[in-house]
Amino acid sequence: MDLNNRLTEDEALEQAYDIFLELAADNLDPADILLFNLQFEERGGAELFDPAEDWAEHVDFDLNPDFFAEVVIGLAEQEGEEITDIFARVLICREKDHKLCHILWKE
């Protein structure tokens, strides 16, 4: 993989959020979609992290944080706080030539 051909943090966040919006209607309860849409402006967010260790239970490849990121999308209790109501965790490959993502949806 090429370190010089990676998505920036902002690009990774934007790409993961776009994928979330495209697939949310098929993967979330209608009530959760309504809540997310009503509250996102005030309490919503997307945060970028290194991939959590539990991804190893869901994928069978090396999750090198140089090339993979986890984007957590959801709602916080108040603006500026940590996201506590998680609607999706998106694992995304940051290498521009490898369009790979995996999503764990709110149950």
UniProtKB/Swiss-Prot annotation:
Pfam families: DUF440
Database matches in InterPro entries: dsDNA_mimic_put, Put_dsDNA_mimic_sf
Entry's family note: Belongs to the putative dsDNA mimic protein family.
Role noted for this protein: May act as a double-stranded DNA (dsDNA) mimic. Probably regulates the activity of a dsDNA-binding protein.
NCBIfam families from the UniProt entry: PRK05094.1
Protein name in the entry: Putative double-stranded DNA mimic protein ECA2319
Source organism of the structure: Pectobacterium atrosepticum (strain SCRI 1043 / ATCC BAA-672) (Erwinia carotovora subsp. atroseptica)
